[in-house]
């Protein structure tokens, strides 16, 4: 190794440490990793059936008619930030104004409806205006992709002392194919205008990687303990639920805030199919394997054994 190359590597190592974002596990050197694979998602153009609209509209009306009394709690704080009433009314009126409803759910990445549990760490407006936020979002994603690849034993575990230049030589698209395509795992169908990695004909986000890892660990626990159901408290948009269903079949129940459970119902029905999801206001049928309920229904749950309770994707 030439002296100049040694000096360059040592300088890169020092700079990587100085500029390291400690939310990342792996060191990235100042050399820019290509950004051409990253962009704002704009390709979700799902056909929404009348059955879908009737089902989600009825659930929204159920939530509106059964909302609990306002208290000085987290839900009250979120309600002041998120325009929940307008969202709820739009979904309730979806049968009358189908175009407005479809426009909202396909492009809600521009809205603040997912405040606190969204796909990105920053809002669309912040990411669009500032390159530094997009760069951080990119590094968070690649950092977790490397960790997930290490978990699957696709690559050796990187030692931070090795520096960022080793990481930059990884073929990220190849790793993505090894994890998703070869395992026949389909990405979660989230809304447009989130910032992520362009993969095949879809997009992947940090929440996809985290949801898949959580699903793998849940699968291990579920099978090793002969359990009968998974219950998630605060399930966000449903990333973990979606990936659990990609890995194995089980009864999966989610409890969450009203507007969050409504959003989860929408995107899980798009991702998993309308008949796979049972909403609280409906009768159960044999096809239902995902159950979505508002948080106050948790006190009606009488099950005591063979259930895995967990919390992963919430505040």
Please state what every model-predicted region is.
Residues 1-77:
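Membrane-proximal basic amphipathic "stem/tether" segments
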Residues 82-225:
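Conserved Class I S-adenosyl-L-methionine-dependent methyltransferase catalytic core
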């Amino acid at each position: 190794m030439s002296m100049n190359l040694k000096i360059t590597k040592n300088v890169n190592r020092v700079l990587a440490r100085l500029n390291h974002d400690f939310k990342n596990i792996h060191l990235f050197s100042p050399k820019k990793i290509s950004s051409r694979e990253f962009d704002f998602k704009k390709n979700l153009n799902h056909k929404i059936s009348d059955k879908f609209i009737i089902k989600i509209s009825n659930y929204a009306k159920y939530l509106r008619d059964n909302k609990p009394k306002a208290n000085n709690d987290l839900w009250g704080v979120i309600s002041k930030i998120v325009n929940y009433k307008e969202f709820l009314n739009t979904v309730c009126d979806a049968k009358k104004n189908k175009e407005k409803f479809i426009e909202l759910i396909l492009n809600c990445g521009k809205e603040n409806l997912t405040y606190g549990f969204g796909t990105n760490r920053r809002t669309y407006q912040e990411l669009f205006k500032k390159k530094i936020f997009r760069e951080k979002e990119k590094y968070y994603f690649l950092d977790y992709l490397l960790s997930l690849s290490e978990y699957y034993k696709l690559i050796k575990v990187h030692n931070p002392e090795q520096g960022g230049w080793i990481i930059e030589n990884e073929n990220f698209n190849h790793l993505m194919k090894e994890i998703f395509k070869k395992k026949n795992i389909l990405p979660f169908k989230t809304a447009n205008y989130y910032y992520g990695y362009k993969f095949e004909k879809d997009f992947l986000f940090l929440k996809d990687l985290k949801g898949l890892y959580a699903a793998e660990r849940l699968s291990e626990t579920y099978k090793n303990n002969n359990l009968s159901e998974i219950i998630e408290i605060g399930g966000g948009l449903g990333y973990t639920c979606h990936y659990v269903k990609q890995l194995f079949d089980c009864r999966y129940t989610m409890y969450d805030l009203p507007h969050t459970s409504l959003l989860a119902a929408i995107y899980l029905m798009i991702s998993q199919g309308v008949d796979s999801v049972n909403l609280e206001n409906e009768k159960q049928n044999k096809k239902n394997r995902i159950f979505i309920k508002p948080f106050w229904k948790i006190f009606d749950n009488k099950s005591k054994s063979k259930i895995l309770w967990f919390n992963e994707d919430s505040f």
